[in-house]
Swiss-Prot record:
GO terms for molecular function: ATP binding; metal ion binding; methionine-tRNA ligase activity; tRNA binding. It is an enzyme of class 6 (ligase). This is Methionine--tRNA ligase. ATP binds at K333.
Length: 674
């Protein structure tokens, strides 16, 4: 039994998942399900990537805390994964004490090995927003390939990485202004010092995809650079120890460590020894990271370097997948092809998309096109027309005429052998992540099964006298071929297979048993396992997507301007007659017999005045002593039954509360307000 730990890239918790995301998660889930059917101890972990400026700013725009935002999207992501039958063994988060402990421990180990340095660097700064701009909040032209509209850390066209200050014609995505440069002290990880570690890892990695190896060779040729692992406050994340929360760990430092935290959390819950899978000496275990091709740089350079220098096992391999296009073009909100996972799930079953993706996925880093017309045709033809149809054509005869019991003899041993002989080839295809090849092999067997049924025509045999035994044997062989096909498809379409298992009265728990025929076995009554996709369902997905983004982009209705009950207009000269002064409250006390008044003694810089103020409902006397406020110093004294009031303190109110005015720090008693 192999010990395998599989991670998938952590989804960023500031928005909903779309079908492009699901491509990678479906790929890894199929592989994990296959490994578990093989009898291997395969643990599948993931979690939410929850730090960074995008989350901080989005939360601010929504009027909620970053913690509330990431909780909201983490829950939505997990529900999408569950409904798409992505079966993680543990789903965690990067924003918790366990991950913080791991991040700080790894940072301290790197620092103790002199792999962390500090230096002042020029940073992009938005003078309008008054903040340093993280990489992803600067856009411009790539300095390498000159592609436009690229982020400040890496180019999505050529894959190059660079500093935001290297961008051509940079602009702030917050204000649209051209950022200026300001110096700030940052923390750097000495990646060049670990070049040998990375190259040793690459040379020992026999499973590394050629495209990844070629890209790594290109980066080595360009020369490795020290990696900036810090970001300036304000920032949502973990503060770097000893910086008084002015510097924070860059999200790409703590995000991969979320893999470790998620697995440690799983180990704690299930009494598993962490070191057996991810210790430095755990040579017998296997560690695989499934990622998108846009984050190879972080997983195949930085991550092995960090792990190798801090006592952790390096990945057995990193498997990258390509991007998703729809109808041959980049996903588009206006065309309705930027389809969110939930929009799909509201209209169609997940099995169809899982199968379609599997029929296109290989071990290469190829972009996958979701051709919607072909998606409908293939789902209806393969799942419904080929596989499920075999059972529907044979089950009724077995259930009604032969007491729901399969024959004790195999009618066509040669055909049975062909189904069995393909087991090794299908197994190898799944193991190597050549899912498209596995699907082709399975569908070729489905074609043979349907040809067998078409040739023998059990529906005609059933009408002929003396052909009962042949009908029994032909239909039993048909059900058995269906059983083998459905077992091979279990990693791909688990919910349909679960229904088939109930019909067959078995449970596929061993991959080795997949090609075995059932003899004298009792089945249940057949019920439809899948229905054909109607084109209208797909059209509705596109329409729902268009409407969703139209609503997002529609201008907000103009709010009615609030109306203020402004007093009658006065001249400037009239206003200047009012002498407003800074006053310090030296004494404050209750007024006996007064429900609303407090007695205040005010110091105006050597001159003392007594004022009765109607602020008792809002303030305790002891809380006011020592505060500075603003008073009308030249208001005619007013004799009250409690004493003489020699002015008025200024306060604001809306009928719900009272707020005395306080001047800015530095204002002194007696200063005139102008």
């Amino acid at each position: 039994m192999r010990k395998i730990l599989v991670t998938n890239a952590l989804p960023y918790a500031n928005g909903d998942l779309h079908l492009g995301h699901m491509l990678g998660y479906i790929q890894s889930d199929i592989w994990v399900r296959f490994q578990k059917l093989q009898g291997n101890q395969c643990i599948f972990i993931c979690g939410s990537d929850t730090h960074g400026t995008p989350i901080m700013l989005k939360a601010k725009s929504l009027g909620i805390t970053p913690e509330e935002l990431v909780t909201k999207y983490s829950n939505r992501h997990l529900q999408d994964f569950t409904d798409f039958e992505i079966n993680f063994d543990n789903y965690h988060s990067t924003h918790n004490s366990l991950n913080k402990e791991i991040v700080e421990d790894i940072y301290n180990k790197l620092n103790n090995k002199n792999l962390i340095s500090k230096k002042a660097i020029a940073q992009a700064y938005d003078p309008e927003a008054k903040m340093f701009l993280p990489d992803r909040f600067v856009k411009g032209t790539c300095p390498k390939c000159k592609a436009e509209d690229q982020y400040g850390d890496s180019c999505e066209v050529c894959g190059a990485t660079y500093d935001p200050t290297e961008l051509i014609n940079p602009r702030s995505v917050i204000s649209g202004q051209s950022p200026i440069q300001k110096n700030s002290e940052h923390f750097f990880f000495d990646l060049p010092a670990l070049e040998k570690n990375i190259k040793d890892w690459i040379e020992s990695n026999t499973l590394l995809q050629p495209e990844v190896a070629n890209k790594l060779a290109e980066w080595f040729e360009q020369g490795l650079q020290s990696w900036d692992i810090s970001r300036d406050a304000p920032y949502f994340g973990f503060a770097i120890p000893g910086t008084n929360e002015q510097k924070f760990f860059y999200v790409w430092l703590d995000a991969p460590m979320g893999y470790i935290a998620s697995f440690k959390d799983y180990c704690n819950k299930n009494n598993i020894n962490f070191g057996d899978f991810w210790g430095d000496s755990s040579s017998e275990s296997e560690l695989y990271h499934f990622i998108g091709k846009d984050i190879i740089y972080f997983h195949a350079l930085f991550w092995p370097a960090i792990l190798s220098s801090t006592g952790y096992k390096t990945p057995t391999s990193v498997f990258a997948n390509g991007f998703l296009t729809v109808n041959g073009k980049k996903m588009s909100k206006s065309r309705g092809t930027f389809i969110q996972a939930r929009t799909y799930l509201d209209n169609l079953e997940p099995s169809y998309l899982r199968y379609y993706f599997a029929s296109r996925l290989t071990s290469r880093i190829d972009d996958i096109d979701l051709n919607l017309e072909e998606f409908v045709t293939k789902s209806n033809s393969d799942i419904v027309g080929k596989v499920v149809n075999i059972a529907s054509r044979c089950a009724g005869f077995i259930y009604k005429k032969f007491d729901a019991t399969l024959s004790g003899e195999i009618f066509d041993p040669e055909l049975e052998s062909e189904f069995s002989k393909n087991h090794d080839a299908i197994t190898q295809a799944f193991e190597k992540r050549e899912f498209a090849h596995a699907v082709r092999l399975i569908m070729a067997l489905a074609d043979k099964a349907n040809q067998f049924i078409d040739y023998h025509k059990p529906w005609q045999l059933a009408k002929e006298e003396g052909q009962e035994q042949k009908v029994h044997q032909v239909c039993s062989q048909g059900i058995n071929m269906f059983k083998v096909l459905i077992a091979y498809l279990k990693p791909i379409i688990p919910s349909i297979v679960a229904e088939a298992e109930r019909f067959l009265n078995i449970q596929f728990i061993s991959w080795a048993d997949a090609p075995k025929f059932l003899i004298n076995h009792k089945i249940d009554k057949f019920k439809p396992l899948a229905t054909r996709i109607e084109k209208e369902k797909v059209d509705k997905i596109l329409e729902d997507t268009k409407k969703m983004f139209e609503n997002e982009q529609a201008p907000q209705s103009k709010k009615e301007e609030p109306k203020l009950d402004i007093a009658a207009e006065c001249t400037f000269d009239d206003f200047m007659k009012v002498d407003l002064r800074i006053a310090k409250i030296t004494e404050a006390s209750h007024v006996e017999g007064a429900d609303k008044l407090l007695k205040l003694i005010l110091d105006l810089g050597g001159v003392t005045k007594q004022v009765f103020a109607g602020i008792k409902s809002a303030y305790k006397p002891e809380d006011l002593i020592g505060k500075h406020t603003i008073m009308v110093a030249n208001l005619a004294p007013r004799k009250m039954k409690f004493g003489m009031s020699e002015g008025m303190v200024l306060a604001a109110g809306d009928g719900k509360g009272i707020y005395i005015l306080e001047p800015h720090e530095g204002a002194q008693p007696g200063m005139r307000v102008k």
